[in-house]
Amino acid sequence: MINKIKKNPDTEVYALGQHICMSAHKARRVIDQIRGRSYEETLMILELMPYRACYPIFKLVYSAAANASHNMGFNEADLIISKAEVNEGPTMKRLKPRARGRSYPIKRPTCHITIVLKDISLDEEYLIWLRKYGWIYRNKYTDRMCRDKYGIVG
């Protein structure tokens, strides 16, 4: 299970969807296809896959990217799906009325989906290497400036 306290909160954001009304097995089939891919590639894959589980996962990925850009100031082009997991939720139990006063149980499975996005431009080893050779300056606030051989790149 993904811990609530993350190892690197400066480069990771997450979105959590609870009590989504579908089987965890069916959601895992889609999650396994997007784990480790970039944000833009994930959106294209989810739009083209013909499964019902794609829509809630699409909304969660989109929400996690909105959290990254609004709360942390990350660029969406630099985000990758670092962790994605599906856990089983509580089963909703209902009764379906049948003939002659009988009833059949209906079990509606639910699941909890967690999507964690990571900003690869701020990876620690990459940042240390860039700072060591003077390629990046980090301001106290969210603006970051990089420079290359020919000038300053924002």
From Swiss-Prot:
Keywords noted in UniProt: Chloroplast, Plastid, Ribonucleoprotein, Ribosomal protein, RNA-binding, rRNA-binding
Cellular location(s): Plastid, Chloroplast
Subcellular location, principal: plastid
GO MF annotation terms: rRNA binding; structural constituent of ribosome
Residue ranges crossing the lipid bilayer per the database entry: none
Alphabetized CDD domains for the sequence: Ribosomal_L22
Family annotation (Pfam families): Ribosomal_L22
Signal peptide span: none
InterPro entries: Ribosomal_uL22 (IPR001063), Ribosomal_uL22_bac/chlpt-type (IPR005727), Ribosomal_uL22_bac/org-type (IPR047867), Ribosomal_uL22_CS (IPR018260), Ribosomal_uL22_sf (IPR036394)
Domain of life: Eukaryota
Biological process, per Gene Ontology: translation
One CC-aspect GO term: large ribosomal subunit
Subunit structure: Part of the 50S ribosomal subunit.
Cross-referenced PANTHER family: CHLOROPLAST 50S RIBOSOMAL PROTEIN L22-RELATED (PTHR13501), LARGE RIBOSOMAL SUBUNIT PROTEIN UL22M (PTHR13501:SF10)
Function description: This protein binds specifically to 23S rRNA.
Family: Belongs to the universal ribosomal protein uL22 family.
HAMAP family cross-referenced by the UniProt entry: Ribosomal_uL22_B
Protein name: Large ribosomal subunit protein uL22c
The species this protein was found in: Platanus occidentalis
